[in-house]
From Swiss-Prot:
Pfam families: Prismane. It is an enzyme of class 1 (oxidoreductase). GO terms for cellular component: cytoplasm. Belongs to the HCP family. The modification Cysteine persulfide is found at residue 406. [2Fe-2S] cluster binds at residues 3, 6, 18, 25. This is Hydroxylamine reductase. SUPFAM superfamilies: Prismane protein-like. The lineage of its organism: Bacteria, Pseudomonadati, Pseudomonadota, Gammaproteobacteria, Alteromonadales. Its cofactor is [2Fe-2S] cluster; hybrid [4Fe-2O-2S] cluster.
Amino acid sequence: MFCVQCEQTIRTPEGNGCSYSQGMCGKLASTSDIQDLLIYMLQGVSAYAVKAREFGIVDNDIDTFVPKAFFATLTNVNFDDERLIDYAYQAQTYRDQLKAAYIAACKGQGVEPEMVSGQGELLLATSKPEILAQAPIALLNGGGVNEDILGLRLLCLYGLKGAAAYMEHARVLDQTDVDVAAEFHKIMAFLGEDSVDADKLFATAMEIGQLNYRIMAMLDLGETTSFGHPEPTQVNTKSVKGKAILVSGHDMKDLELILEQTAGKGINVFTHGEMLPALAYPAFKKYSHLVGNYGGAWQNQQKEFATFPGAVVMTSNCIIDPTVGEYSDRIYTRSIVGWPGVTHVEGDDFSEVINKALELEGFAYDEIPHMITIGFARNALMAAAPTVVENVKNGSIKHFFLIGGCDGDKLERNYFTDLAKSVPDDSIILTLGCGKYKFNKLDFGDINGVPRLLDVGQCNDAYSAIQLALALKDIFECDLNDLPLSLVLSWFEQKAIVVLLTLLSLGVKNIRTGPTAPAFLSENLMNILEQQFGLRGTTDVESDLKAMMNVA
Protein backbone atom coordinates (compact mmCIF):
# COMPACT_ATOMS: atom_id res chain seq x y z
CA MET A 1 0.00 0.00 0.00
CA PHE A 2 1.06 3.54 -0.81
CA CYS A 3 -1.53 6.31 -0.74
CA VAL A 4 -0.81 9.99 -0.29
CA GLN A 5 -3.80 11.54 -2.04
CA CYS A 6 -5.67 13.23 0.83
CA GLU A 7 -4.85 15.88 3.41
CA GLN A 8 -5.02 13.51 6.39
CA THR A 9 -2.35 11.14 5.04
CA ILE A 10 0.43 10.05 7.39
CA ARG A 11 3.42 12.40 7.49
CA THR A 12 6.69 11.34 9.14
CA PRO A 13 10.33 12.45 8.97
CA GLU A 14 11.00 9.25 7.01
CA GLY A 15 8.40 10.04 4.38
CA ASN A 16 4.79 10.83 3.62
CA GLY A 17 1.90 8.55 2.77
CA CYS A 18 -0.18 5.73 4.19
CA SER A 19 1.78 2.53 3.69
CA TYR A 20 0.69 0.16 6.43
CA SER A 21 -2.22 -2.23 6.83
CA GLN A 22 -4.78 0.59 6.79
CA GLY A 23 -4.88 4.21 5.69
CA MET A 24 -5.98 7.15 7.78
CA CYS A 25 -9.29 7.15 5.90
CA GLY A 26 -9.97 3.57 6.99
CA LYS A 27 -9.04 2.11 3.59
CA LEU A 28 -7.43 -1.31 3.96
CA ALA A 29 -4.14 -2.03 2.23
CA SER A 30 -5.92 -4.53 -0.02
CA THR A 31 -8.42 -1.87 -1.10
CA SER A 32 -5.66 0.62 -1.84
CA ASP A 33 -3.73 -1.93 -3.90
CA ILE A 34 -6.82 -2.92 -5.88
CA GLN A 35 -7.57 0.74 -6.57
CA ASP A 36 -4.03 1.21 -7.91
CA LEU A 37 -4.46 -1.83 -10.12
CA LEU A 38 -7.82 -0.51 -11.32
CA ILE A 39 -6.15 2.77 -12.30
CA TYR A 40 -3.46 0.79 -14.13
CA MET A 41 -6.12 -1.06 -16.12
CA LEU A 42 -8.02 2.16 -16.85
CA GLN A 43 -4.84 3.68 -18.25
CA GLY A 44 -4.71 0.74 -20.62
CA VAL A 45 -8.29 1.41 -21.71
CA SER A 46 -7.50 5.07 -22.34
CA ALA A 47 -4.32 4.23 -24.25
CA TYR A 48 -6.31 2.16 -26.73
CA ALA A 49 -9.17 4.68 -26.73
CA VAL A 50 -6.66 7.25 -28.00
CA LYS A 51 -5.38 4.90 -30.69
CA ALA A 52 -8.88 3.82 -31.73
CA ARG A 53 -9.91 7.44 -32.15
CA GLU A 54 -7.24 7.81 -34.83
CA PHE A 55 -9.56 5.65 -36.95
CA GLY A 56 -12.78 7.30 -35.84
CA ILE A 57 -13.62 4.53 -33.38
CA VAL A 58 -15.48 6.03 -30.41
CA ASP A 59 -17.41 4.02 -27.84
CA ASN A 60 -19.69 6.11 -25.63
CA ASP A 61 -20.06 3.34 -23.06
CA ILE A 62 -16.30 3.22 -22.61
CA ASP A 63 -16.07 7.01 -22.49
CA THR A 64 -18.59 6.87 -19.64
CA PHE A 65 -17.02 3.94 -17.82
CA VAL A 66 -13.44 5.15 -17.45
CA PRO A 67 -14.07 8.38 -15.48
CA LYS A 68 -16.82 6.70 -13.46
CA ALA A 69 -14.57 3.83 -12.40
CA PHE A 70 -11.71 6.27 -11.79
CA PHE A 71 -14.07 8.22 -9.49
CA ALA A 72 -14.35 5.07 -7.36
CA THR A 73 -10.70 5.53 -6.34
CA LEU A 74 -11.16 9.00 -4.83
CA THR A 75 -10.88 9.48 -1.08
CA ASN A 76 -13.88 8.16 0.87
CA VAL A 77 -15.79 6.79 -2.12
CA ASN A 78 -15.52 3.02 -2.48
CA PHE A 79 -14.08 0.64 0.12
CA ASP A 80 -15.64 -2.51 -1.35
CA ASP A 81 -12.88 -4.74 -2.77
CA GLU A 82 -15.25 -6.97 -4.73
CA ARG A 83 -16.87 -4.09 -6.58
CA LEU A 84 -13.47 -2.55 -7.31
CA ILE A 85 -12.30 -5.86 -8.73
CA ASP A 86 -15.42 -5.98 -10.91
CA TYR A 87 -14.50 -2.53 -12.24
CA ALA A 88 -11.01 -3.80 -13.03
CA TYR A 89 -12.38 -6.82 -14.91
CA GLN A 90 -14.72 -4.54 -16.87
CA ALA A 91 -11.77 -2.30 -17.70
CA GLN A 92 -9.90 -5.32 -19.05
CA THR A 93 -12.88 -6.24 -21.22
CA TYR A 94 -13.19 -2.73 -22.62
CA ARG A 95 -9.44 -2.44 -23.19
CA ASP A 96 -9.35 -5.67 -25.16
CA GLN A 97 -12.43 -4.60 -27.12
CA LEU A 98 -10.73 -1.36 -28.16
CA LYS A 99 -7.46 -3.16 -28.83
CA ALA A 100 -9.18 -5.58 -31.20
CA ALA A 101 -10.98 -2.75 -32.99
CA TYR A 102 -7.73 -0.81 -33.32
CA ILE A 103 -5.81 -3.80 -34.69
CA ALA A 104 -8.58 -4.48 -37.19
CA ALA A 105 -8.60 -0.84 -38.31
CA CYS A 106 -4.83 -0.89 -38.78
CA LYS A 107 -5.07 -4.09 -40.79
CA GLY A 108 -7.81 -2.56 -42.93
CA GLN A 109 -5.57 0.35 -43.83
CA GLY A 110 -2.40 -1.66 -44.18
CA VAL A 111 -0.52 -0.08 -41.28
CA GLU A 112 1.36 -1.73 -38.46
CA PRO A 113 -0.44 -1.33 -35.10
CA GLU A 114 1.50 0.27 -32.24
CA MET A 115 0.82 -1.96 -29.28
CA VAL A 116 0.74 -0.75 -25.68
CA SER A 117 2.85 -2.70 -23.22
CA GLY A 118 2.20 -2.88 -19.48
CA GLN A 119 -1.28 -1.47 -18.99
CA GLY A 120 -2.18 -2.55 -22.50
CA GLU A 121 -1.46 -6.23 -21.98
CA LEU A 122 -1.81 -7.23 -18.31
CA LEU A 123 -4.31 -10.04 -17.81
CA LEU A 124 -5.90 -10.00 -14.39
CA ALA A 125 -5.82 -13.14 -12.30
CA THR A 126 -9.03 -14.96 -11.42
CA SER A 127 -8.95 -14.71 -7.62
CA LYS A 128 -8.53 -11.87 -5.16
CA PRO A 129 -5.29 -13.22 -3.62
CA GLU A 130 -3.76 -13.58 -7.08
CA ILE A 131 -4.94 -10.10 -8.08
CA LEU A 132 -3.33 -8.65 -4.96
CA ALA A 133 -0.12 -10.43 -5.95
CA GLN A 134 -0.26 -8.51 -9.25
CA ALA A 135 -0.80 -5.13 -7.54
CA PRO A 136 2.89 -4.14 -7.09
CA ILE A 137 3.11 -3.52 -10.84
CA ALA A 138 0.74 -0.58 -10.32
CA LEU A 139 2.30 0.89 -7.17
CA LEU A 140 2.28 4.67 -7.56
CA ASN A 141 5.67 5.26 -5.93
CA GLY A 142 7.46 2.53 -7.82
CA GLY A 143 10.21 3.19 -10.34
CA GLY A 144 12.68 5.03 -8.13
CA VAL A 145 12.09 8.53 -9.53
CA ASN A 146 12.98 11.64 -7.56
CA GLU A 147 10.41 13.34 -5.34
CA ASP A 148 9.76 16.18 -7.78
CA ILE A 149 8.84 13.88 -10.66
CA LEU A 150 6.73 11.67 -8.40
CA GLY A 151 5.00 14.75 -7.00
CA LEU A 152 4.18 16.08 -10.47
CA ARG A 153 2.87 12.69 -11.59
CA LEU A 154 0.63 12.53 -8.53
CA LEU A 155 -0.50 16.14 -8.94
CA CYS A 156 -1.69 15.21 -12.42
CA LEU A 157 -3.19 11.88 -11.37
CA TYR A 158 -5.08 13.30 -8.41
CA GLY A 159 -6.19 16.33 -10.39
CA LEU A 160 -7.53 14.08 -13.14
CA LYS A 161 -9.37 12.05 -10.50
CA GLY A 162 -11.19 15.20 -9.45
CA ALA A 163 -12.04 15.97 -13.07
CA ALA A 164 -13.32 12.41 -13.50
CA ALA A 165 -15.69 12.89 -10.57
CA TYR A 166 -17.13 16.04 -12.11
CA MET A 167 -17.45 14.27 -15.48
CA GLU A 168 -19.57 11.59 -13.83
CA HIS A 169 -21.70 14.18 -12.01
CA ALA A 170 -22.27 15.93 -15.36
CA ARG A 171 -23.04 12.68 -17.19
CA VAL A 172 -25.77 11.80 -14.70
CA LEU A 173 -27.41 15.05 -15.81
CA ASP A 174 -27.06 14.11 -19.51
CA GLN A 175 -24.04 16.32 -20.15
CA THR A 176 -21.32 14.60 -22.16
CA ASP A 177 -18.82 15.82 -24.72
CA VAL A 178 -16.79 13.62 -27.05
CA ASP A 179 -13.98 16.16 -27.19
CA VAL A 180 -13.77 16.29 -23.40
CA ALA A 181 -13.72 12.49 -23.32
CA ALA A 182 -10.94 12.43 -25.93
CA GLU A 183 -8.84 14.88 -23.91
CA PHE A 184 -9.46 12.87 -20.75
CA HIS A 185 -8.27 9.66 -22.44
CA LYS A 186 -5.21 11.43 -23.84
CA ILE A 187 -4.13 12.62 -20.40
CA MET A 188 -4.96 9.31 -18.72
CA ALA A 189 -2.89 7.45 -21.31
CA PHE A 190 0.01 9.89 -20.89
CA LEU A 191 0.03 9.35 -17.13
CA GLY A 192 0.31 5.63 -17.78
CA GLU A 193 3.63 6.26 -19.54
CA ASP A 194 5.30 7.32 -16.26
CA SER A 195 6.93 10.38 -17.80
CA VAL A 196 10.08 11.81 -16.21
CA ASP A 197 9.78 15.09 -18.13
CA ALA A 198 9.03 17.71 -15.46
CA ASP A 199 8.07 20.40 -17.97
CA LYS A 200 5.63 18.07 -19.74
CA LEU A 201 4.11 16.96 -16.44
CA PHE A 202 3.68 20.55 -15.28
CA ALA A 203 2.07 21.48 -18.60
CA THR A 204 -0.23 18.48 -18.25
CA ALA A 205 -1.33 19.68 -14.81
CA MET A 206 -2.39 22.96 -16.41
CA GLU A 207 -4.17 21.06 -19.20
CA ILE A 208 -6.11 19.16 -16.55
CA GLY A 209 -7.12 22.48 -15.00
CA GLN A 210 -8.35 23.76 -18.36
CA LEU A 211 -10.18 20.50 -19.03
CA ASN A 212 -11.89 20.73 -15.67
CA TYR A 213 -13.05 24.26 -16.42
CA ARG A 214 -14.94 22.86 -19.40
CA ILE A 215 -16.30 20.03 -17.28
CA MET A 216 -17.51 22.40 -14.56
CA ALA A 217 -19.30 24.40 -17.25
CA MET A 218 -20.98 21.17 -18.41
CA LEU A 219 -22.02 20.35 -14.87
CA ASP A 220 -23.34 23.87 -14.33
CA LEU A 221 -25.38 23.53 -17.52
CA GLY A 222 -26.69 20.13 -16.44
CA GLU A 223 -27.78 21.35 -13.04
CA THR A 224 -29.39 24.57 -14.25
CA THR A 225 -31.10 22.88 -17.20
CA SER A 226 -32.49 20.14 -14.98
CA PHE A 227 -33.36 22.11 -11.88
CA GLY A 228 -33.31 25.83 -12.76
CA HIS A 229 -30.92 28.47 -11.48
CA PRO A 230 -30.39 28.56 -7.71
CA GLU A 231 -32.14 31.41 -5.91
CA PRO A 232 -31.34 33.01 -2.56
CA THR A 233 -33.21 30.73 -0.17
CA GLN A 234 -33.75 30.43 3.57
CA VAL A 235 -33.03 26.90 4.82
CA ASN A 236 -33.90 25.33 8.16
CA THR A 237 -31.01 23.45 9.79
CA LYS A 238 -32.99 21.85 12.62
CA SER A 239 -34.99 18.63 12.83
CA VAL A 240 -38.65 18.38 11.81
CA LYS A 241 -41.11 15.93 13.35
CA GLY A 242 -41.80 12.79 11.34
CA LYS A 243 -40.25 9.89 9.45
CA ALA A 244 -37.04 10.87 7.73
CA ILE A 245 -34.52 10.20 4.96
CA LEU A 246 -31.14 11.94 4.83
CA VAL A 247 -29.48 12.41 1.43
CA SER A 248 -25.73 13.07 1.41
CA GLY A 249 -23.11 13.34 -1.32
CA HIS A 250 -23.45 15.48 -4.46
CA ASP A 251 -25.95 13.79 -6.80
CA MET A 252 -29.05 15.95 -7.22
CA LYS A 253 -30.61 13.49 -9.67
CA ASP A 254 -30.78 10.92 -6.88
CA LEU A 255 -32.32 13.53 -4.59
CA GLU A 256 -34.97 14.21 -7.22
CA LEU A 257 -35.77 10.50 -7.52
CA ILE A 258 -36.05 10.14 -3.75
CA LEU A 259 -38.34 13.17 -3.51
CA GLU A 260 -40.58 11.84 -6.28
CA GLN A 261 -40.82 8.39 -4.69
CA THR A 262 -41.46 9.67 -1.15
CA ALA A 263 -44.18 12.15 -2.12
CA GLY A 264 -47.34 11.55 -0.09
CA LYS A 265 -45.76 8.87 2.10
CA GLY A 266 -45.35 10.98 5.23
CA ILE A 267 -41.54 11.04 5.01
CA ASN A 268 -39.49 14.20 5.39
CA VAL A 269 -36.32 14.45 3.33
CA PHE A 270 -33.24 16.29 4.58
CA THR A 271 -30.04 17.17 2.75
CA HIS A 272 -26.62 16.67 4.31
CA GLY A 273 -23.13 17.93 3.56
CA GLU A 274 -22.63 18.99 -0.05
CA MET A 275 -26.32 18.36 -0.85
CA LEU A 276 -27.30 21.54 1.02
CA PRO A 277 -27.21 23.72 -2.16
CA ALA A 278 -30.00 21.60 -3.69
CA LEU A 279 -32.51 23.45 -1.53
CA ALA A 280 -31.91 26.62 -3.56
CA TYR A 281 -32.88 25.10 -6.94
CA PRO A 282 -36.43 25.97 -8.10
CA ALA A 283 -37.21 22.39 -9.16
CA PHE A 284 -36.88 21.14 -5.59
CA LYS A 285 -39.06 23.82 -4.03
CA LYS A 286 -42.24 22.10 -5.17
CA TYR A 287 -41.52 19.26 -2.74
CA SER A 288 -42.93 20.37 0.59
CA HIS A 289 -41.42 17.31 2.26
CA LEU A 290 -37.89 18.53 1.48
CA VAL A 291 -37.75 20.22 4.84
CA GLY A 292 -34.16 21.34 5.39
CA ASN A 293 -30.54 20.42 5.97
CA TYR A 294 -29.39 18.18 8.81
CA GLY A 295 -25.86 18.15 10.18
CA GLY A 296 -22.69 19.55 8.74
CA ALA A 297 -19.65 18.39 6.81
CA TRP A 298 -18.62 14.83 6.00
CA GLN A 299 -16.22 14.26 8.90
CA ASN A 300 -19.04 14.53 11.46
CA GLN A 301 -21.22 11.86 9.86
CA GLN A 302 -20.48 9.05 12.31
CA LYS A 303 -22.02 11.13 15.08
CA GLU A 304 -24.73 12.76 12.96
CA PHE A 305 -25.88 9.61 11.15
CA ALA A 306 -25.91 7.68 14.43
CA THR A 307 -28.37 10.18 15.92
CA PHE A 308 -30.44 10.62 12.75
CA PRO A 309 -33.60 8.51 13.30
CA GLY A 310 -34.12 7.53 9.68
CA ALA A 311 -32.54 6.10 6.55
CA VAL A 312 -29.40 7.61 4.98
CA VAL A 313 -28.39 7.58 1.30
CA MET A 314 -24.81 8.27 0.18
CA THR A 315 -25.02 9.41 -3.44
CA SER A 316 -21.28 10.07 -3.84
CA ASN A 317 -18.32 10.93 -1.63
CA CYS A 318 -17.72 11.14 1.28
CA ILE A 319 -18.50 7.93 3.19
CA ILE A 320 -16.61 6.81 6.30
CA ASP A 321 -16.96 3.64 8.38
CA PRO A 322 -20.69 3.26 9.23
CA THR A 323 -20.06 0.46 11.72
CA VAL A 324 -18.62 2.96 14.22
CA GLY A 325 -22.02 4.58 14.77
CA GLU A 326 -23.91 1.31 14.37
CA TYR A 327 -26.08 2.55 11.51
CA SER A 328 -24.78 0.28 8.75
CA ASP A 329 -28.20 -1.41 8.53
CA ARG A 330 -29.90 1.86 7.53
CA ILE A 331 -27.33 3.53 5.28
CA TYR A 332 -27.42 2.88 1.53
CA THR A 333 -24.83 3.53 -1.17
CA ARG A 334 -25.35 4.61 -4.76
CA SER A 335 -23.43 4.67 -8.01
CA ILE A 336 -19.67 4.45 -7.38
CA VAL A 337 -19.99 4.53 -3.57
CA GLY A 338 -19.35 1.32 -1.67
CA TRP A 339 -18.74 -0.06 1.80
CA PRO A 340 -18.52 -3.81 2.56
CA GLY A 341 -21.79 -5.09 4.02
CA VAL A 342 -23.76 -1.92 3.25
CA THR A 343 -26.76 -2.27 0.93
CA HIS A 344 -26.09 -0.84 -2.53
CA VAL A 345 -29.08 0.55 -4.43
CA GLU A 346 -28.99 -0.39 -8.11
CA GLY A 347 -31.25 1.29 -10.63
CA ASP A 348 -33.67 4.04 -9.70
CA ASP A 349 -35.93 2.23 -7.22
CA PHE A 350 -35.52 3.55 -3.68
CA SER A 351 -38.34 1.48 -2.17
CA GLU A 352 -35.97 -0.33 0.20
CA VAL A 353 -34.76 3.01 1.55
CA ILE A 354 -38.34 4.25 1.88
CA ASN A 355 -39.48 1.11 3.69
CA LYS A 356 -36.57 1.40 6.11
CA ALA A 357 -37.47 5.03 6.83
CA LEU A 358 -41.07 4.02 7.52
CA GLU A 359 -39.88 1.32 9.94
CA LEU A 360 -37.72 3.72 11.93
CA GLU A 361 -39.01 6.12 14.57
CA GLY A 362 -38.21 9.42 12.87
CA PHE A 363 -38.00 12.68 14.76
CA ALA A 364 -40.37 12.92 17.72
CA TYR A 365 -40.76 16.70 17.65
CA ASP A 366 -39.88 19.89 15.82
CA GLU A 367 -36.82 21.76 16.99
CA ILE A 368 -36.87 25.54 17.01
CA PRO A 369 -35.86 26.44 13.43
CA HIS A 370 -32.47 27.96 12.69
CA MET A 371 -32.37 29.51 9.24
CA ILE A 372 -29.40 30.11 6.98
CA THR A 373 -29.34 31.66 3.50
CA ILE A 374 -27.97 29.83 0.47
CA GLY A 375 -28.36 30.02 -3.30
CA PHE A 376 -25.89 32.66 -4.51
CA ALA A 377 -24.76 30.76 -7.59
CA ARG A 378 -23.99 32.20 -11.01
CA ASN A 379 -27.32 33.85 -11.91
CA ALA A 380 -27.93 35.22 -8.43
CA LEU A 381 -24.40 36.62 -8.31
CA MET A 382 -24.79 38.23 -11.72
CA ALA A 383 -28.14 39.72 -10.71
CA ALA A 384 -26.48 41.25 -7.66
CA ALA A 385 -23.44 42.46 -9.61
CA PRO A 386 -24.73 46.01 -10.35
CA THR A 387 -25.50 46.60 -6.66
CA VAL A 388 -22.16 45.12 -5.67
CA VAL A 389 -20.32 47.29 -8.19
CA GLU A 390 -22.08 50.42 -6.93
CA ASN A 391 -21.10 49.57 -3.35
CA VAL A 392 -17.51 49.02 -4.44
CA LYS A 393 -17.45 52.35 -6.24
CA ASN A 394 -18.89 54.25 -3.28
CA GLY A 395 -16.46 52.58 -0.91
CA SER A 396 -18.99 50.54 1.07
CA ILE A 397 -17.44 47.26 -0.11
CA LYS A 398 -13.66 47.24 -0.09
CA HIS A 399 -12.70 43.59 -0.40
CA PHE A 400 -13.96 40.12 -1.35
CA PHE A 401 -12.82 36.88 0.25
CA LEU A 402 -13.51 33.44 -1.15
CA ILE A 403 -13.18 31.11 1.83
CA GLY A 404 -14.21 27.56 1.03
CA GLY A 405 -13.34 24.12 -0.21
CA CYS A 406 -13.24 20.89 1.79
CA ASP A 407 -13.76 20.51 5.51
CA GLY A 408 -12.00 18.02 7.79
CA ASP A 409 -11.50 17.20 11.44
CA LYS A 410 -8.10 18.76 12.13
CA LEU A 411 -8.15 21.49 14.77
CA GLU A 412 -6.04 23.62 12.43
CA ARG A 413 -9.14 24.00 10.26
CA ASN A 414 -10.55 26.38 12.85
CA TYR A 415 -8.33 28.85 11.01
CA PHE A 416 -11.10 29.19 8.42
CA THR A 417 -13.70 29.97 11.07
CA ASP A 418 -11.43 32.54 12.66
CA LEU A 419 -10.60 34.08 9.30
CA ALA A 420 -14.27 34.49 8.37
CA LYS A 421 -14.95 36.11 11.74
CA SER A 422 -11.96 38.43 11.37
CA VAL A 423 -12.37 39.87 7.89
CA PRO A 424 -13.22 43.60 7.94
CA ASP A 425 -16.87 44.60 8.13
CA ASP A 426 -16.64 46.21 4.69
CA SER A 427 -15.79 42.85 3.10
CA ILE A 428 -17.93 40.24 1.34
CA ILE A 429 -17.31 36.52 1.94
CA LEU A 430 -18.02 34.01 -0.82
CA THR A 431 -18.04 30.38 0.23
CA LEU A 432 -18.52 26.99 -1.40
CA GLY A 433 -17.96 23.30 -0.76
CA CYS A 434 -18.34 21.69 2.65
CA GLY A 435 -15.74 24.09 4.04
CA LYS A 436 -18.65 26.51 4.46
CA TYR A 437 -19.79 24.58 7.53
CA LYS A 438 -16.95 26.15 9.47
CA PHE A 439 -18.95 29.39 9.60
CA ASN A 440 -22.20 29.25 7.60
CA LYS A 441 -24.45 29.36 10.66
CA LEU A 442 -22.93 32.63 11.86
CA ASP A 443 -24.67 35.95 11.23
CA PHE A 444 -22.46 38.25 9.16
CA GLY A 445 -25.10 40.88 8.43
CA ASP A 446 -25.17 42.85 5.18
CA ILE A 447 -23.71 45.87 3.43
CA ASN A 448 -26.49 48.11 2.10
CA GLY A 449 -28.68 45.07 1.51
CA VAL A 450 -25.94 42.83 0.12
CA PRO A 451 -25.42 39.83 2.44
CA ARG A 452 -21.85 39.70 3.66
CA LEU A 453 -21.88 35.88 3.37
CA LEU A 454 -22.74 34.53 -0.06
CA ASP A 455 -23.03 30.74 -0.27
CA VAL A 456 -22.18 29.91 -3.87
CA GLY A 457 -22.92 26.17 -3.63
CA GLN A 458 -21.06 22.88 -4.00
CA CYS A 459 -17.33 22.58 -4.62
CA ASN A 460 -17.92 22.45 -8.38
CA ASP A 461 -19.73 25.79 -8.12
CA ALA A 462 -16.31 27.37 -8.06
CA TYR A 463 -17.40 27.85 -11.68
CA SER A 464 -19.96 30.42 -10.48
CA ALA A 465 -17.37 32.26 -8.41
CA ILE A 466 -15.05 32.34 -11.42
CA GLN A 467 -17.84 33.81 -13.58
CA LEU A 468 -18.40 36.58 -11.03
CA ALA A 469 -14.68 37.36 -10.91
CA LEU A 470 -14.49 37.48 -14.71
CA ALA A 471 -17.53 39.78 -14.84
CA LEU A 472 -16.07 42.14 -12.24
CA LYS A 473 -12.76 42.15 -14.12
CA ASP A 474 -14.56 43.35 -17.25
CA ILE A 475 -16.66 45.90 -15.37
CA PHE A 476 -13.66 47.42 -13.62
CA GLU A 477 -11.45 47.02 -16.71
CA CYS A 478 -8.61 45.44 -14.79
CA ASP A 479 -6.63 42.24 -14.65
CA LEU A 480 -8.20 39.35 -12.76
CA ASN A 481 -5.43 39.50 -10.18
CA ASP A 482 -5.94 43.23 -9.63
CA LEU A 483 -9.44 42.75 -8.23
CA PRO A 484 -9.85 43.29 -4.46
CA LEU A 485 -10.33 39.53 -4.15
CA SER A 486 -8.47 37.03 -1.96
CA LEU A 487 -8.88 33.27 -2.28
CA VAL A 488 -8.32 31.04 0.74
CA LEU A 489 -9.03 27.40 -0.02
CA SER A 490 -9.30 24.53 2.43
CA TRP A 491 -8.43 21.28 0.73
CA PHE A 492 -8.90 17.64 1.63
CA GLU A 493 -9.18 15.49 -1.46
CA GLN A 494 -8.90 15.31 -5.22
CA LYS A 495 -11.82 17.51 -6.23
CA ALA A 496 -10.14 20.37 -4.38
CA ILE A 497 -6.88 19.60 -6.18
CA VAL A 498 -8.49 19.91 -9.61
CA VAL A 499 -10.34 23.11 -8.65
CA LEU A 500 -6.97 24.54 -7.63
CA LEU A 501 -5.44 23.45 -10.96
CA THR A 502 -8.37 25.09 -12.75
CA LEU A 503 -7.77 28.39 -10.98
CA LEU A 504 -4.03 28.24 -11.67
CA SER A 505 -4.63 27.39 -15.33
CA LEU A 506 -6.83 30.50 -15.60
CA GLY A 507 -3.96 32.61 -14.29
CA VAL A 508 -5.36 33.25 -10.81
CA LYS A 509 -2.52 34.11 -8.45
CA ASN A 510 -1.85 34.56 -4.74
CA ILE A 511 -4.16 31.77 -3.58
CA ARG A 512 -3.71 30.52 -0.04
CA THR A 513 -4.39 26.87 0.79
CA GLY A 514 -4.51 24.96 4.04
CA PRO A 515 -4.45 23.65 6.60
CA THR A 516 -1.33 21.85 5.29
CA ALA A 517 0.38 21.53 1.93
CA PRO A 518 -0.35 18.38 -0.09
CA ALA A 519 2.01 15.69 1.17
CA PHE A 520 2.74 14.52 -2.38
CA LEU A 521 4.27 17.88 -3.33
CA SER A 522 7.93 18.28 -2.47
CA GLU A 523 9.27 21.44 -0.88
CA ASN A 524 10.88 22.29 -4.20
CA LEU A 525 7.58 21.96 -6.06
CA MET A 526 5.81 24.13 -3.50
CA ASN A 527 8.53 26.76 -3.97
CA ILE A 528 8.06 26.64 -7.74
CA LEU A 529 4.28 27.04 -7.37
CA GLU A 530 4.83 30.01 -5.10
CA GLN A 531 7.27 31.61 -7.53
CA GLN A 532 5.03 31.11 -10.57
CA PHE A 533 1.59 31.63 -9.06
CA GLY A 534 2.06 33.15 -5.62
CA LEU A 535 0.50 29.98 -4.20
CA ARG A 536 1.25 29.70 -0.50
CA GLY A 537 0.06 27.94 2.61
CA THR A 538 -2.03 29.52 5.32
CA THR A 539 -0.16 30.70 8.42
CA ASP A 540 -2.08 32.61 11.09
CA VAL A 541 -5.18 34.73 10.59
CA GLU A 542 -3.67 38.06 11.60
CA SER A 543 -0.60 37.74 9.37
CA ASP A 544 -2.55 36.41 6.41
CA LEU A 545 -5.20 39.12 6.67
CA LYS A 546 -2.57 41.84 6.74
CA ALA A 547 -0.95 40.39 3.64
CA MET A 548 -4.25 39.98 1.80
CA MET A 549 -5.36 43.50 2.63
CA ASN A 550 -1.90 44.81 1.66
CA VAL A 551 -1.43 46.23 5.14
CA ALA A 552 2.23 46.53 6.16
